[in-house]
Amino acid sequence: IGKWTTFNDSLDHKVAILSYGPDVDRILQKVMNNNLKVTVINCRFLKPLDKELLKDLADRNMSIIIYETDMLAGGLGSEILEYYNDIQVKPDIIRIGIKDNYVPQGSIKLLREYEHIDLNTLFDKVIEQLKKYD
């Protein structure tokens, strides 16, 4: 209990995507289909955090992209930032999620695009991070 599941990991990977729920499968499929050197982590437990894994990502100097389709405030990314702050580590972190604003009504696809939490936005950030290591 409290251990997250890691997919497509390799010591030469410099980018990790942390997410949860059904999006993990879609993210992993896109990573594999595009042969991206990206680790995908299913953060299936918010509490407790998998601190051992988070410490390992920081020790490996990985860019960490936290992808959640919920509010950023009080979510997975907030918990991870708090943990890193507590251990005084500052890894490269990008958070993708819903900002603290009013969200209009519409289809899930439309709202994800409107809030920039769709997979295209995520993978634009992934490619941006990978280019830093070329």
Describe the predicted segments one by one.
Residues 1-134:
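Thiamine diphosphate
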